[in-house]
């Protein structure tokens, strides 16, 4: 059995899939299985994956139930001890899975480890480097809009952005 499940929720995201899956195909760490959870898409998403990435496990829902239900279904159907949640509009570095897996394995008490997300529109800016909450209970993305060169070392955060993070199955 692989060590990591990569769960990707989707709704009519065909236009993003070539970039996302091409990057996953180049990973330095290969002990992972990809679960693609489709929320009743009307585009060519599933057909594209069947043709170009047949090793991907496709879970087709009959309607658009949203992010939470989709990722929960992917988690339920996967069995690997670690789960990466990954948005379909991401392009990951070659060591993405490896670094997240190593990061969570080094921190035995960690529930999750988050990747630093770089803005899709402004590639020199951070979109999210972990999440915090203010005194009123409002969540905010750490580092949003800062230069991509910041937040280069591991640090404790309150929560991980579920768009690119790894979780221990035992805590899910």
State where each predicted segment sits.
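Conserved donor NDP-sugar-binding/catalytic core segment of glycosyltransferases
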Residues: 91-134
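Conserved short acidic donor-positioning loop in nucleotide-sugar-dependent glycosyltransferases
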Residues: 12, 24, 39-44, 65
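Short beta-strand/loop segment that forms part of the nucleotide-sugar
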Residues: 31-40, 59-61
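Short, acidic, metal-binding catalytic loop of nucleotide-sugar glycosyltransferases
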Residues: 22-31
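A recurrent flexible, glycine/aromatic-enriched loop bordering the glycosyltransferase active site
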Residues: 126, 138-139, 146-170
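Short aromatic/hydrophobic "clamp" motif used to bind/position activated sugar donors
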Residues: 83
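Glycine-rich, basic loop-to-helix element that forms the pyrophosphate-binding segment
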Residues: 61-78, 88, 99
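Acidic helix N-cap motif at the loop->helix transition within catalytic regions
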Residues: 43-51, 95
